[in-house]
Structures are given as C-alpha cells and as structure tokens.
From Swiss-Prot:
HAMAP family the UniProt entry points to: EF_Tu_B
Record domain tr-type G: where: 10-204
Top-rank taxon: Bacteria
Pfam families: GTP_EFTU, GTP_EFTU_D2, GTP_EFTU_D3
Name of the protein: Elongation factor Tu
The organism of origin for this protein: Rickettsia rickettsii (strain Sheila Smith)
This protein's GO CC annotations: cytoplasm
E.C. designation(s): 3.6.5.3
Region (G3): 81-84
Residue ranges of the region described as G5: 174-176
Binding site for Mg(2+): T26
C-alpha cells in the first residue's frame, strides 16, 4: 500500500481518554485505531503498544504518554492516553498534551469512581472545553436499569463540576467487543467518533487569537531604536500596528515599526514565528524580559490568582519535604521568574511532594495573564512544581 497516509487538509483536533484506572481507556484507544483502520483512517495500534507509553519530560517533570493519530471523514485527530493516574494529573496541569476535548471512559459495571471525579474536576480546572462519554464494558451488565442508573450518575457528576451534564453525548459500548471485531462493538466505536466529530468544537487556531508575544530579549540598534525578540504565541502582528507592553510595570502603548525574521524584513509576524519587533519611541530600559507584547486591551496584568498545581515528588527532583501556608517560591511565567506567596485553603495544612492541590498565589509584581496560563514553581533554579491559572482574583 502506498504511504499516502494523513493528508493535512482536514481540520486538526487534539483529544485524549480520561477516567478511572481499569475502566478501559487504553482498550478504547486501541479499539478506535483498529475500527478506523478498516476505512483507512488509522494505523491499527494494539493495546500493549499503547500501554508501553514512552516517558517524556515536560518542564522537568517525567510523564508517560502514548500518542496515536487517526482520522474520521471530517477531522484529523491526535489522541493521548496515559498509563497511570499520576501521568494524567501531570499531563493536564502542565498542558504537555493539549486537549481540545476529552473522551471520559466509565465502566458500566462500576459506575463513576474517585478518579472519574478527579479527572472531570481537573478537566474543568485546566479548561478542557468539552467532553463526550463512553460507557464501556456494557457486555458485563445484563440489567438495562443498571445502565440507566450509571448514565444518570455520570450526568449528575458532570453537571456538579460545571459541564453540561444533560447535553453531553453518552455512547454505550464495549471496547473489548470492538477489539474482537464484533459488529456491535464496532458500531459503538463509530457512534462514539460521530459524537466526538459533532460535539467537540473545532479549536480556534493560534493565528485567529489576539496577538501576543512573550519578550525574551531586548536590544537597542543605533539609529533604529529598540528591538524586542521572542516567539509569537498567538495572533498576527503587522508593521504599523499599535501594541501594548504588558506586565511587571504599568502597561505602555507603542507601535510596531518593523518585523524581522532571520535578518529579513517582513510585513508581518504570526503565531509560531521567532521574530524581532522594532518598537517606535520605546527606550531600551522601558522594556524587559518577562513582559509581553500584545494587541491593545487583549490581556491585563494581574498579581493575585487561583491555581491548580502538581508538586514534584522527591524522585522527580522535587522537594523532599511538604510546604505549608505562606511558602514563597518563584513562579516562572513564559520567560521570567516572579516571587509569590502561596495561601492554602483553610482545610489544608500542607502540600506533600507528589500531590496536586488548589491554592491562591500573590505575586510581588503583576504578570500578563489569563485563565489557562501555565507556569512552573521554582526554588533556587530547580523546578518543584507545575501549575495552571484557574481563576484571576483582582
């Protein structure tokens, strides 16, 4: 067969399987590839290939993640599956595997379990926009009333954590039957993929979002003015456009008078480009690493926020001891460290290495931020945690 595999003409979406241990996430992932392989939309991948997920490092944290790709009639998908619960927690908090949507796998025989709850909560906290449910192992349940009961429980749980529990598609099936090639098993997988296609919204492309570029370096070029360099995170910047410099100090307005890439002058820079941007009338000492250039009014500086954080274990090179209220580490946002103070919730005395927790942070200087922004927590230059901003408080 010719290697005319994935044409990139279809819109791309990142998804992942989440849910309690042993409810069938990896079997489902394998089943999707095997069923879609029949129509040429995937390379059939066996359970043990996915289960032996390689370790990856993301911001100093070791995470095991399996990646598979496949396509339906309408879309191309990159799908992540993690072998262990801790891998999910780390993955979702660090954003190592960006999820535009999730497939929540629940065993019909067991119903929602502790990690089912935790993954739904995490998905809400880190801003996974939508999810579809696969009620797995229905071949192990003889009683239709029990299936109905489990479905109701799942819907209530989703609503409790702020997802539209009444609207979310719940597909009932058996990943095992699909792996065995049974027609009813395959039918459920096809139904699931139709639901994923129609219910999980197409993500907004980075170039369609407002312009934002974290500043990495600042130079002054004699006779031309100040140039800041960095990688454009989102949007497009055109020569002549007004921009704001946000974070660390009061927000300033300036104008982009030139965009340079690989020493060539361009009319514009866009998401993903490493560029130098020439700023009109801005002095070298008025800009610094850690600020961002942004479309006016699109992002504001803040110093108080709530976060969901994973604290590295001792084995991962993290702290050996727990931390308590008023702990003051550095928070590394985009390109710079800012000191901040942690306030734990009233019912939590301490946070242990290897745990994840929700707490409030107050920084000594404001940073350009929006919900969903990722950061690292550092102590003396080493990473001790990773987090995501879940709510801005001022």
């Amino acid at each position: 067969m010719a290697k005319a595999k994935f044409e990139r003409t279809k819109p791309h979406v990142n998804i992942g399987t989440i849910g309690h241990v042993d409810h069938g996430k990896t079997s489902l992932t394998a089943a999707i590839t095997i069923v879609l392989a029949k129509t040429g939309g995937a390379q059939a991948t066996a359970y043990d290939q996915i289960d032996a997920a390689p370790e990856e490092k993301e911001r100093g944290i070791t995470i095991s993640t399996a990646h598979v790709e496949y396509e339906t009639k309408n879309r191309h998908y990159a799908h992540v599956d993690c072998p262990g619960h801790a891998d999910y927690v780390k993955n979702m908090i660090t954003g190592a595997a960006q999820m535009d949507g999730a497939i929540l796998v629940v065993s019909a025989a067991d119903g929602p379990m502790p990690q089912t709850r935790e993954h739904i909560l995490l998905a809400k906290q880190v801003g996974v926009p939508a999810m579809v449910v696969f009620l797995n192992k229905i071949d192990m349940v003889d009683d239709p009333d029990l299936l109905e009961l489990v479905e109701m429980e799942v819907r209530e749980l989703l609503s409790k954590y702020g997802f539209p529990g009444d609207e979310i598609p719940i597909i009932k099936g058996s990943a095992l039957q699909a792996l065995e090639g049974k027609p009813e098993g395959e039918k459920a997988i096809n139904e699931l993929m139709d639901a994923v296609d129609s219910y999980i919204p197409q993500p907004v492309r980075a170039t369609d979002k407002p312009f934002l570029m974290p500043i990495e370096d600042v130079f002054s070029i004699s006779g031309r003015g100040t140039v800041v360099t960095g990688r454009v995170e989102s949007g497009i910047i055109k020569v002549g456009e007004e921009i704001e410099i946000v974070g660390l100090k009061d927000t300033q307005k300036t104008t982009c008078t030139g965009v340079e890439m690989f020493r060539k002058l361009l009319d514009e820079g866009q998401a993903g480009d490493n560029v130098g941007i020439l700023l009109r009338g801005t002095k070298r000492e008025e800009v610094e690493r850690g600020q961002v250039l942004a479309k006016p009014g699109s992002i504001k500086p803040h110093d108080k926020f709530e976060a969901e954080v994973y604290v590295l274990s001792k084995e991962e090179g993290g702290r050996h001891t727990p931390f308590t209220n008023d702990y003051r580490p550095q928070f590394y946002f985009r390109t710079t460290d800012v000191t901040g103070t942690i306030k734990l919730p009233a019912d939590k005395q301490m946070v242990m290495p290897g745990d994840n927790a929700t707490f409030t942070v107050e920084l000594i200087k404001p940073i350009a931020m929006q919900e969903g922004l990722k950061f690292s927590i550092r102590e003396g230059g080493r990473t001790v945690g990773a987090g995501v901003v879940t709510k801005i408080n001022n």
